[in-house]
């Protein structure tokens, strides 16, 4: 029998036994080291004292690659959402920095909302579906809601900014984060895209010629809605994909939040030393009013100053005038013309007119509660002010809608309705699908109308500053105006269906001829 039968791949049994003994010795050394390490940790936790040896501390604090727990791989729906953020939101952030810092701040808040939603989805795919009305589920959405609220506050604090249309578009589209709480998320994303598109049209109108970044920004922003719909259709068609046999949602959310924080924090190897503590705060400023409750204010206290000195002088009565210095005649300007010529004070003085009549404070006006109610076949939307979210109405063709006494409100009307009225509003916008009879605008300032499908006519009376956006289906809309100014109509007849603005004429020419008055639009030649 050949000798090779007693060997294993070129090694004899003696060598294999020696290697086995060496491996066993190493394992024993590792076991002894681990036992000593655990014992030192227990003693250190009891005594609450740091380790004496800095080298040992650095050695023990370094994580071992062999003992590190295996990180669970994210499912495909999570990696796809990460790719969505990187391909859609990150380019928007970079482009917003080229436009203005306030737009960049708004995009950072929007990105923060998507990052919080990523943490939520990581927990959802590993847990059972919770009760949507539970406090745990509400707490999980709180970081997302905080970003939406901050975005609305940023918009309100920059109403005078020239980039207010950007902030409004982001604020109107931000509530799309709520798709995780509904069973039909795709249609919700579409609704908020339509609400945001009202403001993106204004961006294109104002900056199409002056800022090429604005056109690119609008394209990327609207594309982010479409790409989000594609992602939801593929992974969450009927709502968030939960795991039937998964862990409890609260535990999964805590684990997902912890992992997110660990990922964002610097690694121990890169941080060689803890940063120095912040400097102590400066000493508080001295108090303006120095009041002593122990002793009353005396003349010595009056010399020291403070509120005690003020009360001491007031309590003197008529003696307070004894401290005034007598002015000599040579120092009186009304008796010395030379002083009047050299004085910087005007000799005639400034004759101010009567004070302006104070206006009635707005707080004294009766403020009625907001009303959104269907009475019979008529919707009433009244007394809404500064609404951060759009008011959505699902109406039928036999119903009419009345919007009155509202300020800074966006109303979105879905479906075909009978008639729409906009009365006594300020900075209100209406986005509608179709209307059978038309729309009336009465005593409204700075209004906006966007028609998605068809509208036979628009009647405008005693209104100023209106912008109307018509669709291709509504190019035949008839517009009647009376006692109105600054009305502009935007039609999608440009290249790539871009909107072209047409101002409504305001000046009329009236002439008498052949026994009749003839009226025509007055045009300025040249």
From Swiss-Prot:
Residue segments, region Disordered: 43-72, 255-304, 326-371
Position of sequence motif SH3-binding: 169-369
RNA-binding in keyword set: no
Modification sites for Phosphoserine: 454
One Pfam family recorded for the sequence: CAP_N-CM
GO cellular component: actin cortical patch; cytoplasm; mating projection tip
Region of interest called Interaction with SH3 domain of ABP1, as start-end residue ranges on this chain: 354-361
Biased composition, class Polar residues, residue ranges: 45-64, 290-302
A Gene Ontology BP annotation from the UniProt entry: regulation of actin filament polymerization
Keywords for the protein's UniProt record, in alphabetical order: Actin-binding, Cytoplasm, Cytoskeleton, Phosphoprotein
Subunit structure, interactors included: Homodimer.
Miscellaneous: Present with 8760 molecules/cell in log phase SD medium.
Function recorded in the entry: The N-terminal domain binds to adenylyl cyclase, thereby enabling adenylyl cyclase to be activated by upstream regulatory signals, such as Ras. The C-terminal domain is required for normal cellular morphology and growth control.
Family: Belongs to the CAP family.
Descriptive protein name: Adenylyl cyclase-associated protein
Organism of origin: Saccharomyces cerevisiae (strain ATCC 204508 / S288c) (Baker's yeast)
């Amino acid at each position: 029998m050949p000798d090779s039968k007693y060997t294993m791949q070129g090694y004899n049994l003696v060598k294999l036994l020696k290697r086995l003994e060496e491996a066993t010795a190493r394992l024993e050394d590792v076991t002894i080291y681990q036992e000593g390490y655990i014992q030192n940790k227990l003693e250190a936790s009891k005594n609450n004292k740091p380790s004496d040896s800095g080298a040992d501390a650095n050695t023990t604090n370094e994580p071992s690659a062999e003992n590190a727990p295996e990180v669970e791989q994210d499912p495909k729906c999570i990696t796809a959402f990460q790719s969505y953020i990187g391909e859609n939101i990150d380019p928007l952030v970079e482009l917003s920095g080229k436009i203005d810092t306030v737009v960049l701040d708004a995009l950072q808040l929007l990105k923060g909302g998507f990052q919080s939603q990523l943490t939520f989805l990581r927990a959802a795919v590993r847990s059972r579906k919770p009760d949507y009305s539970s406090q745990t589920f509400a707490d999980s959405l709180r970081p997302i809601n905080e970003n939406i609220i901050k975005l609305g506050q940023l918009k309100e604090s920059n109403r005078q900014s020239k980039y207010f249309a950007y902030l409004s578009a982001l604020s109107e589209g931000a509530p799309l984060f709520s798709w995780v709480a509904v069973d039909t998320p795709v249609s919700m994303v579409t609704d908020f895209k339509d609400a945001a598109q009202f403001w993106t049209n204004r961006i294109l109108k104002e900056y199409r010629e002056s800022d090429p970044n604005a056109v690119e920004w609008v394209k990327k922003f609207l594309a982010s809605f479409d790409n989000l719909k594609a992602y939801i259709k593929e992974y969450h068609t009927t709502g968030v994909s939960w795991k039937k046999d998964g862990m409890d949602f609260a535990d999964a959310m805590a684990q997902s939040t912890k992992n997110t924080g660990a990922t964002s924090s610097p690694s121990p190897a890169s941080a060689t030393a803890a940063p120095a503590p912040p400097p102590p705060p400066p000493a508080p400023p001295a108090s303006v009013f120095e009041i002593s409750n122990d002793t009353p204010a005396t003349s010595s206290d009056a010399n020291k100053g403070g509120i005690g000195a003020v009360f001491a002088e007031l309590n003197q009565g008529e003696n307070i005038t004894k401290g005034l210095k007598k002015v000599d005649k040579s120092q009186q300007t009304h008796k010395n013309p030379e002083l009047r010529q050299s004085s910087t004070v005007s000799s005639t003085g400034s004759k101010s007119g009567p004070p302006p009549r104070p206006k009635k404070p707005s707080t004294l006006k009766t403020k009625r509660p907001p009303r959104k109610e269907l009475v019979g076949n008529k919707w009433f939307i009244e007394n809404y002010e500064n609404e951060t979210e759009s008011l959505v109405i699902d109406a039928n063709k036999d119903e009419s809608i009345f919007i009155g006494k509202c300020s800074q409100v966006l109303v979105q009307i879905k479906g075909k309705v009978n008639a729409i009225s906009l009365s006594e509003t300020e900075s209100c916008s209406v986005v509608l699908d179709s209307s059978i009879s038309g729309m009336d605008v009465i005593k409204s300032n700075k209004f906006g109308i966007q028609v998605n499908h068809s509208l036979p006519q628009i009647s405008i009376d005693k209104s100023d500053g209106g912008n109307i956006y018509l669709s291709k289906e509504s190019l035949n809309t008839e517009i009647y105006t009376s006692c109105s100014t600054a009305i502009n109509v935007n039609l999608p007849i440009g290249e790539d269906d871009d909107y072209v603005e047409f101002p409504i004429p305001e000046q009329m020419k009236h002439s008498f001829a052949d026994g009749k008055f003839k009226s025509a639009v007055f045009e300025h030649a040249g």
